[in-house]
UniProtKB/Swiss-Prot annotation:
Ligand binding (2-oxoadipate): H70, R74, H226, V402
Activity regulation summary: Inhibited by EDTA.
Function: Catalyzes the decarboxylation and hydroxylation of 2-oxoadipate (2OA) to form D-2-hydroxyglutarate (D-2-HGA). Is specific for 2-oxoadipate. Is involved in a D-lysine catabolic pathway.
Domain of life, per lineage: Bacteria
InterPro entries associated with the record: HGLS (IPR009770), YdcJ_bac-like (IPR047869)
Classification via SMART domains: DUF1338
MF term (GO), any: dioxygenase activity
Protein name per UniProt: 2-oxoadipate dioxygenase/decarboxylase
Disruption phenotype: Deletion mutant is unable to grow on either isomer of lysine.
Induction: Up-regulated when grown on L-lysine, D-lysine or 2-aminoadipate.
Gene3D superfamilies found in the cross-reference section: Uncharacterised protein PF07063, DUF1338
Reactions catalysed according to its record: 2-oxoadipate + O2 = (R)-2-hydroxyglutarate + CO2
Disulfide bonds: none
Length: 464
């Protein structure tokens, strides 16, 4: 088939993201309510803060805002992870970053599947945080063997989805009809299944080891456990959730409120208790807690220097608090966070000059008008000072460093945490994945460099 008959991976991803949102809205009605609240708040922010809308227009994010979301799944075996990577590749999504969640008391390690080029992200920024269960962290050998045997028996992909993945790999793409079929077949992998694959007793054994182990092992597939829309003001969302009948968690995760947001801020409501049917029970008499609602506000992608400062200030806040943030100490935690982060410049020019964040650069109309004039500035700073080049922070496309990932501990209930210490094993994760994960910092640096090259070309300069 001629390549020009193929649907672009970006388009398939956009279709899949829309279909996933529709499915999740039907499965978790509160998600629909959440989308309404996010839309209301985003419209308010853009009406009341024209500078925010202007920045989004410069970067092109204004067009992607309404469709922006991320999902999260957990798979049980290396084979499942490798195949999910092939499935996401059909949609132009690659593994970016390695996250060791064992240090947060969660027996998984993870990556984010997403598009990696700014043009593709502009079409669809959909991303899926994908975790692999670490069976080696189950300290009971009998329970570990039980989990392995249960996982070995399941098939989380439809045969047609596997056929279409292989066809795409073989032929280099999918046509419109096959792409539509692929989206529907791929959705089956992410659906919620009320029928468990274990008995009530087996479920309890897995659950007693860790709730998340039961969530991964006891069901037919890696149901999407949350789908997260992007807001422009997470504090307004946090305040507005109760009026919509959505109880928010005590603390917004990540950095404090800022004029210029950095990295990622997240809040959520606790997981839903859902009825399930265990193998040895008639009807749906059991229950399981897994899926929750989450909202995020994305800010500037930080450089290694910026990340180091972020981690330092966050650690200082945790030490001063003397424990993990919770409902009882939420007010004190937020006050400490705000005070400590006063050290992090809340000004884009200062962040740029100090090398704390990545930026995108744009040739202005003034710059284009002067592109052939003699004596015009030729250095980047000179061009910025003269108004020939405009800059905006590159949006953070990834996830919170685990040091801030309290979402993972809090949304399943306060007793969901176990002690695993830090057991990072990127090599084992990549072996299971069958691919190397990409370095997110290198991707931001490349994106920044491409924008500088585009500016230089537009302004008739050799380089900047």
């Amino acid at each position: 088939m001629p390549a020009n008959d193929f649907v672009s991976p970006d388009s398939i991803r956009a279709q899949f993201s829309a279909a996933m949102s529709l499915m999740y809205k039907q499965e978790v009605p509160l998600y629909g309510t959440l989308l309404e609240l996010v839309s209301e708040i985003n419209q308010q922010v853009m009406a009341q803060q024209p500078e925010v809308a202007e920045a989004l227009r410069w970067t092109g994010e204004i067009e992607r805002l309404d469709q922006e979301r991320h999902g999260a799944i957990r798979v049980g075996t290396a084979e499942e992870l490798a195949t999910i990577a092939r499935l996401f590749a059909v949609m132009g999504m690659q593994p970016v970053g390695y996250y060791d969640l064992s240090s947060a008391g969660v027996p998984v390690h993870s990556t984010a599947f997403r598009a990696v080029h700014e043009q593709s992200l502009h079409v669809s920024p959909f991303r899926v945080f994908t975790s692999l269960l670490r069976l080696e962290l189950i300290d009971n050998p009998q329970l570990r063997e039980l989990a392995q045997s249960i996982l070995a028996k399941r098939q989380i992909f439809t045969s047609r989805a596997l056929e279409l993945i292989a066809q795409c790999e073989r032929e280099g793409g999918l046509d419109a009809a096959d792409a539509e079929t692929f989206v529907q077949e791929a959705l089956h992998t992410f659906r919620w299944h009320q029928d468990a694959t274990v008995t009530a007793e087996q479920y309890q054994q897995l659950h007693d080891q860790h709730r998340l182990i039961a969530d991964v092992v006891a069901f037919k597939g890696p149901h999407i456990n949350h789908l997260t829309p992007r807001t422009l003001d997470i504090d307004a969302i946090q305040l507005g959730m109760p009026a919509k009948g959505i109880p928010p968690k005590a603390v917004v995760e990540g950095p404090p409120t800022r004029r210029h947001p950095i990295l990622l801020r997240q809040t959520s409501f606790k997981a839903l208790q859902e009825t399930v049917a265990f193998r040895d029970q008639q009807g749906r008499e059991g229950s399981h807690t897994a899926r929750f609602g989450e909202i995020e506000q994305r800010g500037a992608a930080l450089t290694p220097k910026g990340r180091q400062l972020y981690d330092k200030l966050l650690d200082a806040t945790r030490v001063a608090l003397g424990g993990a943030p919770a409902e009882a100490n939420a007010e004190r935690y937020m006050a400490l966070l705000q005070a400590n982060f006063a050290e992090f410049p809340d000004d884009l020019a200062q962040m740029r000059e100090q090398g704390l964040a990545y930026f995108r650069y744009f040739a202005t109309e003034k710059g284009l008008a002067a592109r052939d004039q003699e004596g015009r500035p030729t250095t980047l700073q000179g061009l910025i000072d003269a108004g020939h080049v405009h800059f905006e922070a590159l949006v953070y496309e990834d996830f919170l460093p685990v040091s801030a990932a309290g979402i993972f501990q809090s949304n399943l209930g306060d007793d969901a945490q176990a002690e695993y210490g830090s057991n990072a094993n990127r090599e084992a994760f990549e072996a299971a994945l069958g691919l190397q994960v990409q370095d997110e910092l290198a991707l931001y640096a490349q994106s920044e460099r491409r924008s500088l090259q585009a500016c230089a070309q537009a302004l008739n300069l050799g380089s900047m």
